From Swiss-Prot:
Places the protein is found: Secreted
The protein's name: ESAT-6-like protein EsxM
Native organism: Mycobacterium marinum (strain ATCC BAA-535 / M)
Alphabetical keyword list: Secreted, Virulence
Disruption phenotype: Disruption of the gene results in decreased dissemination independent of burden.
Keyword Coiled coil included in the entry's annotation: no
Origin organism lineage: Bacteria, Bacillati, Actinomycetota, Actinomycetes, Mycobacteriales
Length: 98
């Protein structure tokens, strides 16, 4: 399998936008799940069942936050690298012009 490297700054920024959309989707779904767990806890669950449910949801919330952080990290890296490619391209063109 041949590896393809992304070197087009515009394509890199487009891809960064996709990662941002994915991060937003994960955040939205995590919020819905958290709200749903609060409704369960308020629907008569008590004691160990409620505590276990909240603990599980807390762990899932942490996992989703980690996923969002990773997606944002990739997004930020793509934008940073796109900017670096453009700066290097401009510097190379200036050198070639003499």
């Amino acid at each position: 399998m041949t590896a393809r490297f992304m070197t087009d700054p515009h394509a890199m920024r487009d891809m960064a936008g996709r990662f941002e959309m994915h991060a937003q989707t994960v955040e939205d779904e995590a919020r819905k799940m958290w709200a749903s767990s609060q409704n369960i806890a308020g629907a008569g669950w008590s004691g160990m069942a409620s505590a276990t449910s909240l603990d599980t949801m807390g762990q899932m919330n942490t996992a989703f936050r980690n996923i969002v952080n990773m997606l944002h990290s990739v997004r930020d890296g793509l934008v940073r690298d796109a900017n670096n490619y453009e700066q290097q391209e401009q510097a190379s063109q200036q050198v070639l012009r003499g």
